[in-house]
A protein has these predicted regions:
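SH3/SH3-like beta-barrel superfamily modules
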Residues: 73-111, 156-192
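Boundary regions of SH3-family modules and the immediately adjacent low-complexity/disordered segments
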Residues: 36-43, 99-132, 180-211
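Solvent-exposed, polar/charged alpha-helical surfaces in well-ordered, non-transmembrane soluble domains
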Residues: 71, 98, 223, 320-327
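SH3-family beta-barrel domains
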Residues: 24, 34-63, 72-75, 114-148, ...
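N-terminal export leaders
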Residues: 11-25
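Cell wall/extracellular polymer interaction/catalysis modules
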Residues: 167-254
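N-terminal secretory signal peptides
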Residues: 1-13, 35
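Exported/periplasmic cell-wall-interacting domains
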Residues: 209-211, 235, 247-254, 261, ...
Length: 351
């Protein structure tokens, strides 16, 4: 059984690429030589904003918890970013820190890189629904569109949701009518905070490669996945697999599997194999299931703790990586399909 994800990367370079991947970058071996990948690593930068995950999150004078504490930040604070700093250490902690605009540093574990992109609302929405993503750090999901409306939920950057209509409130603000996919509850969301995902963004990748020409290998020890075409690595990403929490074993199962079921958006609850305890997660993006018990690849907006076990069994990925896996693997999902089931999917090896 292989113990290395790729045959060409040294341990030192693997650590470098792992750190870059944990910052949300995808390592595409097809378009980059090793030298170019190293250059990409050294020049890597983050988005311009970041969202804080929890109250009391500290920033420091240097990229280390041993530095002077500069400030404490609260849940959903949105902070300006300058760049990412990759620590060249070999101990099992997150190696990525973000430098803030005030020149202090915050650990990437506590912080989601986000954007603040406003969008022109799309007036024509097909009756079967259209997939959309949140493009601002977070936005309210209202239970009604009238005066005295109450915010029931918050939707977060990168989450995906099904839109079924465009409306207007008393103040002439445009909103999308969103129906979540588990209980069919209806929410009203500022239409400028969502971007309708175009059909071409859902088309399959490398579709000429036959089913037996693709596979994904997951290393639980290295907390990395590599996708292969005809046994050549084509893409690498950091991940967060299932964890052992006290006497409860939520670790990701080892073995050989196949992707058999996909959803581009899923409302996950405590009965699912999700990432946080006692939490409901709305609009989990790009879900590709590969076991009968519901273990899946999916995008992650509620933590940024890649390269360490963190989930209830699923393979948590940076959102761009989960989107890539969703498109690259079989079965291919037609645009505007809310779910798709097939027993003939891409092979997944977990070691």
């Amino acid at each position: 059984m292989a113990t290395r994800l790729t045959k060409d990367l040294s341990r030192r370079d693997f650590l470098k690429f792992s750190a870059l991947a944990s910052a949300g970058a995808l390592i595409d071996f097809r378009s980059s030589s090793e030298a170019n990948l190293l250059k990409l690593f050294e020049q890597s930068k983050t988005d311009l904003l970041g969202r804080v995950f929890k109250d009391g999150t500290p920033s420091y004078s240097e990229p280390s918890a041993k530095g002077q504490q500069i400030a404490l930040h609260n849940y959903n604070d949105v902070l300006g970013l300058k760049d990412a700093v990759i620590l060249k250490t070999d101990h099992p902690v997150n190696e990525v820190w973000y430098r803030l605009e005030d020149k202090s540093f915050i650990n990437s574990y506590d912080f989601q890189p986000v954007e603040n992109q406003l969008n022109a609302p799309q007036s024509e929405i097909v009756s079967s629904g259209m997939l959309a993503e949140i493009t601002v750090p977070f936005t309210d999901a209202w239970s009604s569109s009238t005066n005295g409306k109450k915010s029931n939920q918050i939707f977060y950057f990168g989450s995906t949701h099904w839109v079924f209509g465009l409306g207007e409130d008393e103040a002439k603000n445009l909103y999308y009518l969103v129906k979540e996919d588990r209980f069919n509850n209806t929410y009203y969301v500022n239409a400028t905070h969502m971007r309708i995902i175009q059909d071409e963004e859902l088309l399959p990748l490398s579709e000429l490669i036959p089913l037996d020409g693709k596979h994904i290998r997951i290393s639980l020890r290295q907390q990395m996945m590599v996708a292969y075409e005809k046994n050549e690595p084509v893409l690498m990403s950091a991940l967060a697999s299932g964890q052992l929490t006290g006497s409860t074993d939520l670790t990701t199962p080892v073995g050989n599997f196949a992707i058999n079921y996909k959803r581009p958006s899923r409302h996950m609850v405590h009965s699912d194999r999700m990432g946080d305890n006692g939490t409901e997660l709305y609009g989990v993006p790009w879900v590709s299931y590969f076991t009968e018990t519901g273990i899946a690849f999916h995008g992650t907006y509620w933590h940024n703790n890649f390269t360490r076990p963190h989930s209830h069994g699923c393979i948590n990925l940076p959102i761009p990586a989960a989107h890539w896996v969703f498109r690259w693997t079989q079965p291919h999902v037609p645009p505007r399909e809310q779910k798709f089931v097939s027993q003939f999917g891409t092979q997944v090896e977990v070691i």
